[in-house]
Amino acid sequence: MQAKAVARTVRIAPRKVRLVVDLIRGKQVGEAIAILNHTPKTASPVVEKVLKSAIANAEHNYEMDINNLVVEKVFVDEGPTLKRFRPRAMGRASQINKRTSHITVVVSEKKEG
């Protein structure tokens, strides 16, 4: 059985979130939360919040045991890009892309044995 949580349109670039997400893939949830607490990245609290939501969904909706949960899948997709303009020299302007992310965390119970 799997439980899932998604955070959509998070205002952090996907490239930056993927650095954090790659640290917790395949880990037990307790270990994953400990890793996120000690990772000095802006994306860490956001990913931790999504992970805790997935754990709560597993416990409440599917009555899984929290002690046996493993981060099965975690991935980051690109959300809508906010386009802004920055003034440049000689009356020109250049485009600034403010990227957003969709963060998905899937947890499942570890197989016995």
From Swiss-Prot:
Part of the 50S ribosomal subunit. It holds the Pfam family Ribosomal_L22. This is Large ribosomal subunit protein uL22. The keyword Glycosyltransferase does not apply. The gene is rplV. It comes from Bacillus cereus (strain ATCC 14579 / DSM 31 / CCUG 7414 / JCM 2152 / NBRC 15305 / NCIMB 9373 / NCTC 2599 / NRRL B-3711). GO terms for biological process: translation. Belongs to the universal ribosomal protein uL22 family. This protein binds specifically to 23S rRNA; its binding is stimulated by other ribosomal proteins, e.g. L4, L17, and L20. It is important during the early stages of 50S assembly. It makes multiple contacts with different domains of the 23S rRNA in the assembled 50S subunit and ribosome. The globular domain of the protein is located near the polypeptide exit tunnel on the outside of the subunit, while an extended beta-hairpin is found that lines the wall of the exit tunnel in the center of the 70S ribosome. GO terms for molecular function: rRNA binding; structural constituent of ribosome.
